[in-house]
Amino acid sequence: LTSLFTHAAKIYDLPVNPCKKVKRMGNSDSRSLNFWTLDEYKQFIQTMEPGTRYYLMFEMLFWTGCRIGELLAITKADINFEKNQLSINKTYYRTGMQDIITEPKTKQSFRTIEIPEFLKEEIKEFVDGHYGMPDTERLFPVVQEAVQHKMKRQIELAGVKKIRVHDIRHSHVAYLIEKGVEPLLIRDRLGHKDIRITLNTYGHLYPNQQRKIANLLDNENGNAVTGLGEERDEC
């Protein structure tokens, strides 16, 4: 809805976007995030044929954490195959019968995502399979509703718990947190405007961080005590 009014403000000289005056509903510190583990995602993706459109779409959603609107706006020109980088610089949505491609919602949403080698190869194979694809053509010329429908059907086939398309983004973050990736790096990868958004949304997924701090202090204190003892002996 915000994107729709933003478009209206730009194109039809709407004086103000009313959505920007409405506070976000609910608690931003959401402890009820719904996401898949890596095993659950693998169970889901295995229901699709590798190399197909939807297979690659879900691969990119899970392994980059991009938003669905950002994914649907990606063109061949946004992919740097030499540097393994994906440029996020626009977003797509559909209103009525019109396809709208506009700038991302915040300055921080403009970003370059480093992608793993295997994902780069999957994208390259898909692009090469569409010979003559123009650099400015959308990789995935479908609408969000089609992605949602496909995901719902494959969830039933896979027998995994039901989540939304946007929850795949949460799944990406949960995976990164499990691997020990720092919040600041996650913020930049997701395109969050403020680190507080990242921490308020995902901070509770760091259950072992306080224990790590205590262990770190124990180690430092032990080193300090050892050092003091050695100094006394030398004196």
Stretch-by-stretch model annotation:
Residues 35, 92, 120, 145, ...:
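Catalytic-site neighborhood detector that most strongly recognizes the C-terminal catalytic loop/helix
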